[in-house]
A protein has these predicted regions:
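C-terminal and inter-domain tail/linker signature
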Residues: 1-141
Length: 141
């Protein structure tokens, strides 16, 4: 594993979040190792491998919220681990969780914990406030 500085890792994470804003699934997925394991709060099973991450995480969010922005609020780096507190801002333009597009803007806080090996994410834990997202979409009170 190559040594990673906090500056290098922050640039890597910013580029990863920029790929989300571009909403090109293949570009987002290029930041993950082939055998990546992602645990997303609210998703009942671990997402193991790029196909599972694409189908159950990347594609649902990029289709529903194209052009989404992750603003980094806090960044902590230690070795090959990084913790990012972020604000997700997007307009609901496509179906999400069986809900048709509402054209509503959402602002949802979240946090990601990633393990980075070389230049790829190998493991991730993603926490965000699902009830806040659904409330902002008009699905929950």
């Amino acid at each position: 594993m190559k040594a990673q500085t906090a500056i290098d890792t922050r640039q890597f994470i910013q580029q990863y979040f920029d790929a989300w804003e571009e909403s090109v699934a293949e570009k987002i997925l290029s930041y993950y190792s082939d055998d990546v394991v992602i645990d997303v709060l609210g998703v009942p099973a671990l997402l193991e491998g790029k196909p599972a991450v694409a189908e159950n995480f990347v594609l649902p969010f990029t289709r529903a919220f194209p052009g989404n922005v992750h603003k980094i609020l806090n960044f902590i780096h230690q070795g090959n681990q990084v913790v990012i507190e972020w604000m997700f801002t997007a307009v609901h333009k496509g179906e999400f969780s069986d809900m048709p597009a509402t054209a509503r803007t959402v602002n949802v806080p979240g946090c990601s914990v990633y393990t980075i090996e070389g230049d790829q994410i190998t493991r991730g834990h993603i926490y965000f406030n699902g009830p806040t997202l659904l409330k902002q979409l008009g699905a929950a009170s």
